[in-house]
């Protein structure tokens, strides 16, 4: 499945590169337009309108663009084929589970895939544009003597880290389900560490947003905080179900 998806991406590499891969650094990207329109609609002026930045990538080796195309195809193949990859992994792990444990993981492939793609979309449409806009526009010194000229591989690596990182980070509710099920964490533990989680999320949101205004940071903070709250709800539900099963066996 990975190879098949990679071949398809490689065949249509020019279109995918122009309209998908370089989307987050395109001034006309849908996220930029939506945030700016929302800013005007909410009577915030230009608060959420990120200034366009010019990003000129370079390839400093003869085979750089070709290798970049292969890298883009393979990474894209892995992302698109993630449900199949996890399904294969699950087929390997499932026989080691007990019958009641296996029954409680009936929809695990769907939920793992759902949260992965949700996180990947968050990284691509929100975190990616914020990050690249900030890093490309950041200037050291006041004379403008330093120009940011990222390589193709540098951009692809950063975009990959953002998408895969967010995809895996959004697996937090699934991870909370598993860790609660095996007794490593509990809903009370997650609730007691909520204040620390809020501080960490606020720091992350402040670091990756291009401007210091509260609205930009709130847009990044909100989905991450909701993800943590969802993990608490999932953990609480699993914990109650586990206690009920223990009472039935006793």
Predicted regions and their residues:
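Membrane topogenic/interface segments and analogous intrinsically disordered interaction regions
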Residues: 1-250
């Amino acid at each position: 499945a990975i190879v098949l998806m990679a071949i398809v991406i490689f065949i249509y590499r020019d279109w995918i590169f122009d309209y998908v891969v370089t989307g987050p650094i395109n001034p006309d990207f849908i996220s930029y337009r939506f945030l700016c329109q929302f800013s005007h609609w909410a009577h915030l002026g230009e608060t959420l309108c990120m200034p366009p930045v010019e990003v000129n990538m370079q390839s400093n080796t003869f085979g750089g663009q070709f290798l970049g195309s292969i890298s883009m195809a393979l990474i894209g193949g892995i992302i698109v084929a993630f449900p199949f990859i996890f399904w294969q992994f699950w087929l390997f792990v499932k026989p080691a589970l007990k019958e009641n444990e296996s029954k409680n993981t009936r929809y695990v492939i769907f939920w793992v895939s759902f949260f992965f793609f949700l996180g990947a979309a968050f990284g691509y449409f929100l975190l990616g544009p914020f990050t690249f806009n900030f890093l490309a526009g950041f200037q050291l010194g006041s004379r403008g003597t330093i120009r940011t000229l990222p390589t193709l591989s540098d951009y692809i690596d950063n975009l990959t880290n953002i998408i895969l990182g967010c995809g895996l980070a959004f697996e937090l509710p699934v991870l909370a389900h598993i860790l609660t099920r095996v007794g490593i964490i509990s809903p009370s533990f997650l609730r007691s560490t909520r204040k620390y989680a809020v501080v960490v999320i606020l720091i992350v949101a402040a670091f990756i947003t291009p401007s210091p205004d509260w609205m930009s940071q709130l847009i990044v903070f909100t989905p991450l905080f909701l993800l943590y709250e969802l993990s608490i709800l999932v953990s609480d539900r699993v914990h109650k179900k586990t206690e009920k099963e223990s009472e039935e066996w006793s």
